[in-house]
Design a protein with these regions (language model features):
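Right-handed parallel beta-helix
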Residues: 153-156, 160-229, 233
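Beta-solenoid repeat scaffold
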Residues: 60-63, 99-100, 110-142
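All-beta strand scaffolds that present successive hydrophobic residues in beta-strands
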Residues: 102, 124-127, 162-165, 186-189, ...
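Consensus "Asn ladder" position of solenoid repeat domains
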Residues: 167, 191, 196, 214, ...
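Short, T/G/N/S-enriched strand-turn elements that build extracellular solenoid repeat scaffolds
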Residues: 87-94, 108-119, 154, 178, ...
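Right-handed parallel beta-helix/beta-spiral solenoid domain characteristic of secreted/periplasmic
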Residues: 122-173, 312-313
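Right-handed parallel beta-helix/beta-solenoid
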Residues: 29-87
């Protein structure tokens, strides 16, 4: 009997630095092959390891398998030969240092999922990172009562030291969010966020996730919203046709590096007291602006000591800071001078330490001044 197909797991984390050979399972459609990997070969997998969860080197990694087509939550043990039917069940039994491997299919209420899916520390949900989760779809949402933002409808709730890798996330419910991060810092890599009616990802509170190598396409509001005092690292993602690609508000200060943002309404919206840092991004063909700053928002687009190296092409305006009361440091970018509005410091000499800070009495539970499409 053919076993359900799971993507090969060469990319799963390996315990390194032990001076020993390591054994991992390479999973294929019909068989499991044991392969011993030398320390030299382990080094060749460093790129894959960067997308893997932290491991406790003293304990073995556990694998759980899920198939919405042939799995069974009532009788299965989560092995490759006897997979669970739902991610919900796999998360119930998962302990730290567990990877939950998903077979292609749609994971929804119809297949037995209970939303939101609540990630756990030290646990990874992995589909197929090589295709950014094509054909492995988490579809649906449920109510989460956010301490900072009231009731929200979300597909996945993040957790510290958790990972979501190689899946497609879609929340078609009204005001639906794909992944919600409430003062948590998971790693989200090589996923696709599409057709979420509000945002692909929302980070609030003191979240500091790594969001890398994902694709955001045709979301109703924003690709990513960054609120509160969040400081996510947003690297090497693609945002296209997705409202505002990145919406930054309150006192958030994300690092936004080497992303491509095209065909959105606005690529990066900066409002309230937000202080994002943008380096090495390509921002092109956005309908209104490449970067918009309003109120006290102050994006750092480059200083004399740290050039921005952002490329702006064919936007309505490359930088629109006309409604911001801040000087915008913007040294070392490629753009058209007559597509810049507001007080822009092209020499990059602005002293960011002397810029406006929010009043001490201001709370962080406000709602963004502008929401795309809302």
């Amino acid at each position: 009997v053919a076993l359900p197909h799971f993507a090969a797991i060469k990319s799963l984390p390996l315990a390194t630095g032990l001076g020993l050979s390591l054994t991992i399972g390479l999973l294929h459609a019909s068989k499991t092959i044991a392969q011993t990997i030398s320390n030299q070969e382990v080094a060749q997998l460093s790129a894959a390891q960067s997308a893997a969860p932290p491991m406790d080197s003293a304990s073995a990694q556990h694998l759980l398998f899920v198939s919405p087509m042939v799995g069974n939550d009532a009788t299965a043990d989560g092995s490759q030969r006897s997979p669970f039917r739902t991610i919900t069940q796999a998360l119930r039994v998962a302990q730290p240092n567990t990877v939950i491997l998903l077979t292609p299919g749609t994971y929804s209420v119809d297949s037995g999922e209970v939303f939101p899916l609540i990630l756990k520390p030290g646990v990874t949900i992995q589909g197929d990172p090589s295709t950014q989760g094509r054909g492995i779809v988490l579809r649906g949402g449920g109510t989460f009562l956010s301490p900072t933002s009231a009731g929200q409808n979300i597909t996945v709730l993040g957790a510290d030291q958790s990972q979501l890798v190689g899946v497609t996330v879609t929340n078609p419910n009204p005001r639906g969010y794909g992944v919600w991060l409430e003062s948590s810092s998971p790693t989200l890599t090589n996923n696709t966020f599409t057709h979420n009616t509000h945002d692909g990802i929302s980070t609030v509170g003191n979240s500091a996730p790594l969001i890398r190598g994902n694709r955001f396409n045709q979301n109703g509001g924003n690709g990513i919203t960054v609120f509160g005092q969040s400081r996510p690292e947003i690297r090497e993602n693609v945002f296209e046709q997705t409202g505002f690609a990145i919406n930054v508000a309150e006192q958030a200060a994300p690092l936004i590096v080497n992303n491509r943002m095209s065909q959105n309404k606005i690529a990066v919206l900066v409002q309230e007291y937000a202080r994002p840092v943008l380096r090495g991004n390509t921002i092109e063909n956005n309908q209104q602006d490449g970067v918009t700053a309003i109120a006290h928002g102050q994006p750092d687009l480059g200083t004399a000591g740290d050039p921005g190296n952002n490329i702006f092409r064919d936007n309505g305006l490359d930088l629109n800071a006309d409604a911001s009361d801040q000087v915008i440091p913007a040294f070392g970018n490629q753009w058209i001078a007559d597509r810049l509005e507001g007080e822009v410091d092209l020499a990059g000499t602005t002293n960011l330490a002397q810029t406006v800070s929010p009043p001490a009495t201001q709370t962080l539970q406000t709602v963004a001044v502008i929401q795309s499409g809302r």
